[in-house]
Every structure is written in C-alpha cells, then in structure tokens.
C-alpha cells in the first residue's frame, strides 16, 4: 500500500528476512539500507522488516542481498490460459508494473516471483489480464531442498516442455483427515467422491489412519471437502504432519471412549438377559404380566439403541441416503429387526403362533455391546500402528537455542529462519537441518538411519533434524527448515507410502465394495427360504437367520486386512532407516530373486584412500611431498586420496613449476629443474620409466585389486602408492545372507574386470559384469529381466539412475545423488548393504501378514455366512445364535488387527530394534 509522506508517494513494504542471526545483523542491515536508499523503518527484527521508501522492491532487495541476506516471500504458481509468447509478454508487462513484485519470471506454464503481496492478490493480478494462477506446491520427496529448488526453477527452455511434465511438476499432494469411515465400503465411497473432483489425479484413502492423500492440480481445495461431505462424511485439510498426527490421535481416542461406553452399556444390559435365558428363564410372551415385564425391558433396549447404538443407525441412514450400504447397515438392520420383532410380539402376541412368541432383546443388547467392544479393542490397536510415525514426529524439539551477539536466546523451532546460527548442547536433539560451523561432537543418527554407531560431526559436516547430540557442543547454520528438513520429508514419504495400496489390497477393496449389498441379499434370501420351507415357528426362525447373517458378516475385517499390514510394515521399515516410496514395492520386493549391486559407494565406501606405500628412492615424506605437490592441482578422484593422506601425515608439498596435466594419464611438473611424474603405470612406461624394480610389489597390489599410482623423479621410479576404495564393513554380511536366502547376487560396475573380480571373490558375489559404461547399465538390467529374473538394483550415483528406474525394484543409498534417490522406489538412509537384506525380509514378512489377514477374513466370511444362514440345521439341527454371531464378528476384526501388529515383532536380519 502506498502512503503520502511530505507530499510525495512512498512505497510501503513488509518483508520476511532470512540469514540474519541477531539484532546486530539487523542493525547492520539498517545502516546498509540508509546508505543505499532513503528509508523510514517502522519495525525491524532478524526475521522481518517493515519500511517506507521511494525505492522499488527490486532496489530494496538488492540492498539486502548485498550483505548476503535475503528478503521477501518467494511464490510459485502454475499458469493456465497462456498459449504463446505474446501472452507471456502481456502478463510480464502487467506484473512488472507492480512495485511490490521483484525477481519476476513468467513462462507459458509457470510464474515465479518475490513479492510482499498475498497469494490471493497475485492471483487477482493475473486474473486481471485474463489468465489463471494456481499455487504450485512441489510434492514432498526424499531429496535435499536444493534439488527440489532446481526442479522448480524455470529455464529458457521451459516453454518447450511437454504439458505432461508441467502438470506433474505442479501437482499438489493434500492430506485430509476424514471422519465417519467404518469399513471398506466407506473407503470405496470416499475414493470415488474424491476422484470425481476436477483436477484430481489420484486419491489414496486409508481406513486405519482415517485419512486420504489426494494428488492433483487444485485452484481451490474446497471442492474436495464438498465431495466428501456430499458422500456423507466429514473432512478437513491438514498440512502440518504434527497437527495431523495429533488430530488423528484425538479422533482415535474419542472413538475409543465412545466404543468403550457403548460396550459397557450393551454388555451390562445384555449379560443378565442372556443368562436369564441360558438358565431357563422365561423369554416367551404368554400372558399380560409377561407383556408388561418384557415391554419395560424392550423400552430400556430402545433407549440403548438410541444411545450406545445411535452411531450404527445414524451411519446406516447416512449411507442409505447416499445410495450405499456399509458395515453399520448390517448392524443396524440386524439389531433393529431383532428389537422390532420382539416389540411386535410384546404388543400383539395373539398375532403370532405360540411357539413364535419368543423375544430377542438380549440379542439386541449383546450385539451392540460385543461389536462395540470389538471396535474399542480394534481402535486401541490402530493407535499402535501409527507408533512409528509418532516416534518420527517426536524427534523434533519444540525449542532451540539461537546464537546472537547479545548471547544465546531460546527460540521456537517454528520461528527458525535459514542462515540462523543455533547452538546444540550435549543431550539435545538437532532442531533443523544444518551445517556445523564450530565445535565437534558425536551424533546419534539411529532414529533416522537405523545405524546404531554415533557419527562424528565437525566443522563443515551436515546434520539432520531429529538426530541426538551426545557429549560435545556444536554451533550449526540452518540450511533446511520446516517441510524441507530431511525429517519432514521422511515423515511425508512414510505417510504417502502407508496410504498407497499394492495390487492385492486393491483387489480386496473391490471385493469389499460389493460385500455389504451381497450380504443383505443373502440375508433376505435366507429369510425367505426359512419362511417358505423352514419348521415352525417360521417367523421366529426367519428373524433369527436373517439377523445372524447380517451380524456375522464382517466387511470390517476385509477392509482392515491389508491397510493395517502396510501401515505397520512401512512404519517398521522407517524405524530401520528404510524409506519405501509406494506400498507396491513391498509386494514386488518379496518376489526378488536377483540383487544387482553397483560397486562404488554401494559395496565400497566411495572414498578412495591410500592402502599401502612402497618407497624405492629416498623416504616416504619426500615421496609424499612430491606426489602432493602435483596432485593438489588435479581434479582426478584419486588425487584427493593422496592429498588427504599427505595432510594426515602433516606433509607439506614442495614448490613446483611448469605443471602439466595429461588428462587420464598422469601429471608432469618441474622441481629443482628436474621433471617429476605422477600417474599410472602406462604413463610411466610412455615416459621411459623402468618399473622392473617394483614388479613384485605391483603384483601384490594387483592381487588385492589396489590401483597403483607411481611417482618418478630425475628419470627414476621413486615409489608407488596403492589406492583402493575400501569395502564397507557390512558388504560381506549382506552378500552372505542374500546367498543363504537363495538370491542371485551380481556386481555391475564400470571398474576394471580384475578389480571387480577381486572384490566379488572377497565378498562372495556370484556374477560380475565389469567395465560397463554408464548408459549400458540399464541394458544389463534388462538382459537379466529377459532371463525371467525379478531384479533389484542397488546404486547411489547419477549413472545408476536409468538402471534403478528400469529394475523391478530400484534401491538407492541415502548418501547417493538426488537423481538416484528420485529414480528409486526404496531409499536406505544408513547406506548399508545389509539394509537390502532387511528390506527384502521385511517385504516378505509384510506380504505374508497381508495374505494371512486376507485369508482369515475370507475364510471367516465364507464359512460364517452359510452357517449363519442355517446350512448345518438339516443335518445337525444346529442354528447359530445372533449373540454368538456378534461375538464372532468382533473377534474377526480383533484377530486381523492383532495379527497385523504382530508384524512389528517379526525377526528381521540386521534389525537393531529386534535384536
């Protein structure tokens, strides 16, 4: 908003600030602004500034950035309606005229800017020239913030990108908390409602968490809420993972309380009635006194239906008005029919044959009580399935210590800005992602990576939110806050995976969606058959059979069979430092029979180091000083190993001149007017250096797959350094266990065959494919698949990305490149090969658990419904009681939930949590 000041219009800006650590920084900024511009500052803190100035926003931001700080709010939008370059120019001209907008970039599909305007104001400005802007939120994935920024930044070629790419890049993922779902039929209804909304690309509804993840392009999320409401449910959007978890927990606790009260009321009333009948008490209406007594009991039972059973009837009615049937429909029909029949008998006994004047009030009460008890136990168990996610959320502290010029200050984690300096004291958890600026300490990263050994952190080392500082004190600079911390991305990835569904689960959902209507039809047909062909009293038998069929059928068990197993399995994987992108991975990983390892960074540490030093002339220090002098000017991967080794030995490089790098062969330079050579054996031979004196040493190096780097001076070989990429301590364990499981192991590497074979022999790898160019790795994966193998590829580099994407399962090391991680369906945060074994075993255990749950649910319903319909009566005279049916229904759900939670205690190799 512009205001007049001394007769001159001045601009008013309220800007967010980043990079300022204290009020000293703020005062420094104030001096810079007054030096560069004419400003009147109203308020100034390390995180915000409000000022009046004649300058434009661009000029203000330039002044702020001259000190290394950042100001303003970055906003990104997906654009619709721009068809050509003229449209882009039109919008650019219109927005450029706004003083509150800076750093503007417009393409046909995308708008990015820094502004003091709100999102609604920006959308309104875009609408003024006939276009539409939609806020673009990149889907959270396990990738560093920098890589996300790179993906979202437009390039000059952005206009030529396909519409598909633009759509995918701008997709939002919204988390919804849903209230009112009770069974798989509800899940199907909610998914159908969400998918009917324009712009929705996918919808994943989770019965266990009472939540939904919706992906698509939304100008306004309100239609999603309207669609759910029109289906008879309630929903709200939750962006904050901690808030979502808290609300889900509160919802579960409220349901527990409701089910507990209903169970107590139902069982308290039903138990004496049932015992009265069991021990020979009269439950027939024979005279007026029976009518009075049972009429009173019927009234009490009606009150029970209005209180403890109220939610069954309300949910059933709501489902009916929306043209569907749910588990509540079955309970409401069964208990309602039993009560209504009994009241008819009480009111007009003369209309029924003597043998049919039996009342079933005990069935009404006990069914409500037992099913509510089952729901209570089930809901309590559900809250345990989210324990892994809650543990992740609990890792981030609420307060942090901000380092300022005035001393340390306590600050809320939500108020931390990028660039702030934070002190991490012994025993404290790291509040945000950052880089260590001063201090050193060991950090326990086991809660994120599953790796129990603390990791040393010194200046320059990266730290992640949620890790635990041990005995030292650190000062870190915040580099990732809020949703961009590794912890937040892990939580989002786990939540998405838990809401996804493998093929087996989708099949179960399809069956569940038609289950209730089929059961209602079976109940009606059974009642008709008993009425037509059953013994007297027909009406009584008809009621018992129909009620029992309705009550015993349990879509709840079917609906929970797979989501619970997935939630527990993926949660356990997260505890072990294994991130799973989609639940389908569990099903595929359980079928893997071939594991392909990249070598560098996967089986090895990816950090070449000196393994041995053989001196022929002079001493070690002179040899290292010569090698260090040349290698410090090289970019070769092995050069760093030599330089680091020399630094560790406190060796100083000699002064050289005339440095020459013969790329891929070796290095030359002059030292004291004599030539120094450092490089490969082939390079030495080209330069006429005699290697025969080191022949036995070189053979020894070759046998151990060490790479020799020779050093020559004055035309004579001075010595040889052996360099190798050390094998990870856990690689041999992983390969040995995979071989025990009958899984074929393969090493796929670009390294020399001799080196690859030596490492494969040491580790016990079955097959070696060496000297493979980066673009050929995917071809070798395809060749293995053509042999009928189910292939898992494990890699960490950019060159592994195509192979990771092509494999049946792509597994990326958490220490690897962002491209590799994005191409994989699974990420190992601890970068340990043993986690591959754990992931495969856990996938098999989860799939086995899902099959057990589905088998149990199907068998229960397949046997229970016919028995309830009375198929055993002609041969054995046995007819199931509605009360027993209610108990069986409750027990089936409890069994499924308990079996899913049993997965938490499965013995998985190399799992520190189960040792």
Curated annotation (Swiss-Prot):
<dbReference type="InterPro" id="IPR036412">
    <property type="entry name" value="HAD-like_sf"/>
</dbReference>
<dbReference type="InterPro" id="IPR023299">
    <property type="entry name" value="ATPase_P-typ_cyto_dom_N"/>
</dbReference>
<keyword id="KW-0406">Ion transport</keyword>
<dbReference type="GO" id="GO:0043682">
    <property type="term" value="F:P-type divalent copper transporter activity"/>
</dbReference>
<dbReference type="InterPro" id="IPR006121">
    <property type="entry name" value="HMA_dom"/>
</dbReference>
<dbReference type="GO" id="GO:0016887">
    <property type="term" value="F:ATP hydrolysis activity"/>
</dbReference>
<dbReference type="InterPro" id="IPR036163">
    <property type="entry name" value="HMA_dom_sf"/>
</dbReference>
<keyword id="KW-0186">Copper</keyword>
<feature type="binding site">
    <location>
        <position position="796"/>
    </location>
    <ligand>
        <name>Mg(2+)</name>
    </ligand>
</feature>
<dbReference type="Pfam" id="PF00702">
    <property type="entry name" value="Hydrolase"/>
</dbReference>
<dbReference type="GO" id="GO:0055070">
    <property type="term" value="P:copper ion homeostasis"/>
</dbReference>
<keyword id="KW-0472">Membrane</keyword>
<keyword id="KW-0067">ATP-binding</keyword>
<keyword id="KW-0460">Magnesium</keyword>
<feature type="transmembrane region" description="Helical">
    <location>
        <begin position="359"/>
        <end position="379"/>
    </location>
</feature>
<keyword id="KW-0677">Repeat</keyword>
<keyword id="KW-1278">Translocase</keyword>
<dbReference type="GO" id="GO:0140581">
    <property type="term" value="F:P-type monovalent copper transporter activity"/>
</dbReference>
<dbReference type="GO" id="GO:0005886">
    <property type="term" value="C:plasma membrane"/>
</dbReference>
<keyword id="KW-1003">Cell membrane</keyword>
<dbReference type="Pfam" id="PF00403">
    <property type="entry name" value="HMA"/>
</dbReference>
<feature type="domain" description="HMA 2">
    <location>
        <begin position="73"/>
        <end position="134"/>
    </location>
</feature>
<feature type="transmembrane region" description="Helical">
    <location>
        <begin position="801"/>
        <end position="821"/>
    </location>
</feature>
<feature type="domain" description="HMA 1">
    <location>
        <begin position="11"/>
        <end position="72"/>
    </location>
</feature>
<dbReference type="InterPro" id="IPR023214">
    <property type="entry name" value="HAD_sf"/>
</dbReference>
<feature type="binding site">
    <location>
        <position position="84"/>
    </location>
    <ligand>
        <name>Cu(+) 2</name>
    </ligand>
</feature>
<feature type="binding site">
    <location>
        <position position="186"/>
    </location>
    <ligand>
        <name>Cu(+) 3</name>
    </ligand>
</feature>
<feature type="transmembrane region" description="Helical">
    <location>
        <begin position="541"/>
        <end position="561"/>
    </location>
</feature>
<protein>
    <recommendedName>
        <fullName>Copper-exporting P-type ATPase</fullName>
        <ecNumber>7.2.2.8</ecNumber>
    </recommendedName>
</protein>
<dbReference type="InterPro" id="IPR044492">
    <property type="entry name" value="P_typ_ATPase_HD_dom"/>
</dbReference>
<feature type="transmembrane region" description="Helical">
    <location>
        <begin position="329"/>
        <end position="349"/>
    </location>
</feature>
<feature type="transmembrane region" description="Helical">
    <location>
        <begin position="865"/>
        <end position="885"/>
    </location>
</feature>
<feature type="binding site">
    <location>
        <position position="87"/>
    </location>
    <ligand>
        <name>Cu(+) 2</name>
    </ligand>
</feature>
<comment type="similarity">
    <text>Belongs to the cation transport ATPase (P-type) (TC 3.A.3) family. Type IB subfamily.</text>
</comment>
<feature type="binding site">
    <location>
        <position position="183"/>
    </location>
    <ligand>
        <name>Cu(+) 3</name>
    </ligand>
</feature>
<keyword id="KW-0187">Copper transport</keyword>
<feature type="region of interest" description="Disordered">
    <location>
        <begin position="142"/>
        <end position="169"/>
    </location>
</feature>
<comment type="function">
    <text>Involved in copper export.</text>
</comment>
<keyword id="KW-0479">Metal-binding</keyword>
<feature type="active site" description="4-aspartylphosphate intermediate">
    <location>
        <position position="598"/>
    </location>
</feature>
<keyword id="KW-0547">Nucleotide-binding</keyword>
<dbReference type="InterPro" id="IPR018303">
    <property type="entry name" value="ATPase_P-typ_P_site"/>
</dbReference>
